[in-house]
């Protein structure tokens, strides 16, 4: 079986370093908000290129805390609108609605799969307070035009970087392109913990201070609570593991890019559409999506041939039961993506032989 993601093989590459990190935490006797968190926050902020990094419990919390922070600072209020791509993962939408804000869904482009920046400006209303761009599949969802639009209209530009660790635009990493970035370290990410973990990156000192307090029950001083906060803290164990993994992130991304280059060169089937190829700096290939009108048949065929795949994602947010008031809306490009997308094996431990198996099966699909 060619696995979509072989976490065991990925983990065993640096097992001794992980064991040493875990041993260090155990021997310290300190498991929350300690030296490991401080070290990872410093190293990740330096890697991303921001002044601040706040380690939190998961990627969804990171998204929620950015928006909540802006509400506490008076930048946003209940009922304000946030522009967001219609084809994003549900977490992006949940963070907005959980903050009593209104998601304004904007279509992606079919070629690029990311937010159609040319449609952003027409979606702006007097109630719009921000844009949440999502670097889906590891592909950049930013350009200078988006930055200019947000500046011109006084909007906060927030990045969902859950799938884009290490991706850059003109030398600037995702998470440093806008006003704040939310990061997920779910185990399957390019930079993944051994459990759930997340972070917020920003240059905004005031926002960082508020988010740090909100994530710690709303407290800036022990047992003194300025805000109605939440419990969203990264464990010392996960911080220690992530700091080990961070050293290898760029190398791992290069291996993903090499695999993607082979897929682009070798996949040749008129029934299969590949997304527009980007420069390597603009894509860290969290997933490698392919598209087929007979997607379900293709997935069953690949499974029979010993290739594991996954759909990202079978149901778009506006068709989910939890947002049933949106179910009658029509977003044709989003729906086409969700009807045809199939993710094939993409990670740094896929061998050339395994990649050839994947390509051979795809090319022979009829």
Protein language model regions, located:
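Structured binding elements
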Residues: 100
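Short beta->alpha connector loops at strand-helix junctions that form conserved
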Residues: 86, 105-109, 313
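Active-site phosphate-binding strand-loop segment of PLP-dependent enzymes
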Residues: 111-193, 199-201, 343
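N-terminal "arm"/small-domain region of PLP-dependent enzymes with the aminotransferase-like
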Residues: 1-30, 35, 305, 345
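Phosphate-binding glycine-rich loop
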Residues: 30, 35-81, 95-97, 105, ...
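PLP-dependent aminotransferase class I/II
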Residues: 37-42, 47-54, 60, 118, ...
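Conserved coil-to-alpha-helix start sites within the AMP-binding
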Residues: 87-93
